[in-house]
Amino acid sequence: PLQYAAIRSSHPAFSWIVPGETGGTRQTAYRVIVADNHEDAASGRGNLWDSGVVGSDQSVAVRYAGEALKPGKSYFWRVKTVTNTEGESEWSEVKAFRTADRLSEYETAYYPQVKTMEFPAGITEIHPGTRLVDFGKDAFGQLVLTLASDGTRDSVIVHLGECLEGGRILRDPGKSTIRYHRYPLALLKGTHTYRIKIGKDKRNTGSAAVLMPAYVGEVVPFRYCEIEGYEAPLSPASVVRETVHYPFDETASSFRSSNELLNQIWDLCKYSVRATSFLGVYVDGDRERIPYEADALINQLCHYGVDREYAIARRSHEYLLQHPTWPTEWILQALSIAWYDYLYTGDSRSLESSYELLKPRVLMALREKNGLISTTTGLQTDDFLRSIRMKGQIRDIVDWPHTGILGLGKKQGGEDDGFAFTDYNAVTNAWHYEALKLMEGIAGALGKQDDATFYASESDAFKKRFIRSFFNARKGYFTDGLASDTDHASLHGNMFPLAFDLVPAGKKQNVVDFIQTRGMACSVYGSQFLMDALYEANDAEYALHMLTKTDDRSWYNMIRVGSTISLEAWDNKYKPNQDWNHAWGAAPANIIPRRLMGVEPLTPGFATARIKPQLASLEWAEATIPTIRGAIRMEVENKVDTYVPVSYTHLRAHETSAHL
């Protein structure tokens, strides 16, 4: 059946990029029309809705105000604008959209997955009758072969895998979940095209997993294909990988700098976003295919950094509100995902729809008498768990994996820097503070002023309480728990407070100094917040060092071991059961545009933006950074004793605050 991006709301919202090439162009008015037939729309008649000329600079999330749309119908819309430099525009092209078979007042629309035909980057004969096909990059897909047989050979063996060992596909990945599959293929006489039937894996098709849609079929991740027992000529056109992914615009973003290693890391992480989008929602990789909030948060920011695409993140977020996962901090991260969605799109409909689900995820119900939250003091009542849609207890995670699990030896350290878990956890409480701040912003955006005032008061009081509880004034940094419980200090117990503005006045450098003593003592997940913390503290040089270092706890190590998608962990030895296709390891895809190049929205929908490049020792950098209002293109030179201003062209109807 035909697949299309169905509009699922009876009152959708419209966005457009304001035309005009003159510097300083701003929209001053707009007019939107919606018709139920192409003829009316083409003639400038909105027989369902005509907004009239609206004096406004709003060009994102303009809500349809006509009669409710009907399910299963096609509609047509167009817009014209007035700007301060070019006056009234012509009508835009007529754009069509079709509604879903079932509509509600609000439901997120999304694109269907697509297939891209990809041909080999190279074919090598290993020995007579066996060829190794390399597609150049790992991807989730299906294999289509066109093979010939004279009838004397009735079958071949097809091997698919992600990794090579000794010039052959790795057949025994050990404890890891690096993928390998073997498929016998019976040949018919003559030349025929065969589609390899991918079988379901019990590990990633269970009740908690997101399943591939029937119109696509099952997929596996593979870069390499070996065809064994085939002696006829094999051309690149006869070996096709149909790669499955969410629609992706390769031209929407770019980055290059004077550091070639950093450029390679950007390429790895940008590609990882496309490659891991195969399910149409963000998941944790191929091993489980389950959405988790932490994966979704990092993936969301990375996707915003590499493509002008927002629906997949919103769909993933709304799925997780109904299907939350067990870590305490990840329940709290629902607030971050919701806020970033609003900040990057300017569309508050998801916030409105989800508001009552977001409030309990601040975890006020877990507040103890001392004002801190705890998951271990008996406060996880049935009512509380129902309020956050959880079927079991939640537990603090800090980072993952912990010591002695998932293939690690009993005494082999995990990724939490030896964090001392106690009843009152500095990391969990830092996330609680962040959630309070975000809930204040969400309530304010929705006009719920009493709630906004409440959360503002709570966050102000909680910041003081957090510092009193966890900051060791004598040492100048935070401990993992209360002084009565532990004096252990970890990277995590300090990087999260630094990232969330919880460090006491005048003590930021002390905390940064401590963080630098810990190195990359966190997982690829934790690295997102380490990088955020360092750039928040304006420690760009150390941040650049961490981005570009080359030991086995680095993004470069992912390239060195042979992966073309970001790994689940820094190396197999740090998580022996890891995937080689995990977008939560792709943090540079958002850290580079958001932090190094310094482009972030200050107000919802990029109505105002901050451009604050922190190049450190890079000689130069240039980037194209997507936003919902259009692309920001930047060129920055970094010369000693020479003032070289940022050169950038940016979207219209937009204000920018530049920092040098």
PLM features: residue spans?
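Active-site acid/base region of carbohydrate-active enzymes
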Residues: 224, 233-315, 325, 329-332, ...
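Repeat-solenoid scaffold signature
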Residues: 520-550
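Short, solvent-exposed loop/turn segments at the edges of secondary structure
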Residues: 27, 140, 217-222, 294, ...
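Extracellular/oxidizing-compartment recognition motifs
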Residues: 1-280, 295, 309-312, 349, ...
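Solenoid-like repeat scaffolds
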Residues: 325, 514-521, 552
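Well-ordered alpha-helical scaffold segments within catalytic/enzyme domains
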Residues: 298-307, 334-350, 431-448, 495-505, ...
